[in-house]
Regions:
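Glycine-rich His-Gly loop
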Residues: 1, 49, 120
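Short, surface-exposed "cap/lid" segments of acyl-processing enzymes
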Residues: 1-17
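Short, structured coil segments at secondary-structure junctions
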Residues: 11, 62-63, 143-145
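Serine-dependent carboxylesterase/thioesterase catalytic core
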Residues: 15, 23-112, 125, 133
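Hydrophobic pocket-lining residues within nucleotide cofactor-binding pockets
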Residues: 20
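C-terminal catalytic-base region of ester-bond hydrolases, centering on the histidine
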Residues: 109-157
Length: 157
C-alpha cells in the first residue's frame, strides 16, 4: 500500500506528506523536511527505507511522539559502501553507507518514545552481506535495541 492510498482511506486532517530527492544530500533534505514541519505537531512519523532514517533524525528537531519505520537500514548499507565508487554522482550511496555521517549520527540518537520497525524478510539478493529483503540486510534493519520489531514476509518494496 502506498502512503497516498492510505491518505485517501483515513480521516486524518493534519498529516504532512513530505517528499525529498535522493539526488540531494541527506542534510539538505533533512533541513527542508524540518522546515516544512516546524511550528506544527506533535508529530507521529512514518518512513520507508531511507525515509525511516530521516524520521529518526527528526526526533532531534521536532516534537515527535512516536514512529514507524519500514525496512530502514539503521546500520547503513555495505552495498552503498562500494556502490558510491561505481556511481559517485549519486548522493544516496554516500549518505547511506555504514560509515556515513547520517548513519553514524543515527547511532547517537536514543529513542524514549514508542517506535516500531517493520522488517521485510523476503527477496534476498546474493551480493548483500547476509540475509536481506533485496535492498537492506536484516542485520541493518534490526540493529537498534530501542524499538519494537515486526517481521513481515515481504520484499523491500
Amino acid at each position: 500500500l502506498s502512503f497516498k492510498y492510505l491518505q485517501t482511506k483515513t480521516q486524518f486532517s493534519k498529516e504532512i506528506m513530505v517528499n525529498y530527492s535522493s539526488m540531494d544530500r541527506f542534510y539538505d533534505n533533512l533541513d527542508m523536511i524540518t522546515e516544512q514541519c516546524q511550528n506544527r505537531g506533535p508529530h507521529f512519523v512514518v518512513g520507508h527505507s531511507m525515509g525511516g532514517l530521516y524520521a529518526l533524525h527528526l526526533t532531534k528537531y521536532l516534537r515527535v511522539v512516536g514512529g514507524v519505520s519500514i525496512s530502514t537500514p539503521f546500520r547503513g548499507s555495505s552495498t552503498a559502501d562500494w556502490a558510491k565508487y561505481v556511481v559517485p554522482s549519486y548522493p544516496l550511496f554516500r549518505d547511506i553507507g555504514r560509515k556515513s555521517d547520517p548513519v553514524k549520527k543515527a547511532h547517537e540518537i536514543k529513542l524514549d518514545i514508542p517506535w516500531t520497525q517493520i522488517v521485510s524478510t523476503t527477496g534476498s539478493v546474493p551480493y548483500h552481506n547476509g540475509p536481506n529483503d533485496g535492498v537492506v540486510t536484516l542485520a541493518s534493519m534490526t540493529q537498534r535495541t530501542d524499538m519494537e520489531y515486526i517481521e513481515v514476509p515481504h520484499t523491500h518494496y
